[in-house]
Amino acid sequence: MSFELSASVVLWRGDEILVMKRAGGFSAGGWFIPGGHVEQGERPVESAARELFEEAGIAVEPEALTLIDVMSYETGRGTAHTIIYNGSCADATEAAINEEHIYHRWMTAEAYIARFLDEAMLRTRGASQSAIDLANEVARVIRAAATARSAPLSSV
């Protein structure tokens, strides 16, 4: 069994979040928020900012990211943990894609959940139970990010 640690950013542009379609490898064709593995000697928040820049060409300071939640899920090789942060960018910000992705879009959090994470839709498409469990976990943390974003800072 292995232990995997990654960090991801729910990046807000106004009321929309950035999602990116994977080109190949892990979950090819899936739509995800930017993120990736925490490198040796790197703090998770630094990884989140680095991955956002590498995957989308958008620079944010690690200090500008807010911790939201930790998502844990089984990978077949062990348990993976992804630390989720909220971030924001200017309304005119555009994302670029790297070789890991073939497309990106900005959409509301609820539209993302309904379009890509809906359990009934995934079951109809024959998704495995582990894929459905992961989608439910992603939907949970996206909702937590939306809730935290609208809450007063003193309650976050």
Describe each region flagged by the PLM.
Residues 59-69:
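A short coil-to-beta-strand element that immediately follows conserved catalytic motifs
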Residues 32, 66, 84:
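Conserved beta-strand segments that form the floor/walls of ligand-binding pockets within enzyme
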Residues 71-94, 105, 109-110, 134-145:
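Active-site-adjacent beta-strand/loop module that shapes the phosphate/pyrophosphate-binding cleft
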Residues 36, 50, 63, 107-110:
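Structural detector for helix-capping/boundary residues
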Residues 4, 12, 33, 78-82:
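Short connector loops at helix/strand junctions that flank enzyme active sites
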Residues 1-18:
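Conserved N-terminal beta-strand and adjoining loop/helix that marks the start
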Residues 16-54:
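Conserved Nudix-box catalytic region and its N-terminal flanking loop in Nudix hydrolases
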Residues 28-30, 99-156:
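Nudix hydrolase/Nudix homology domain
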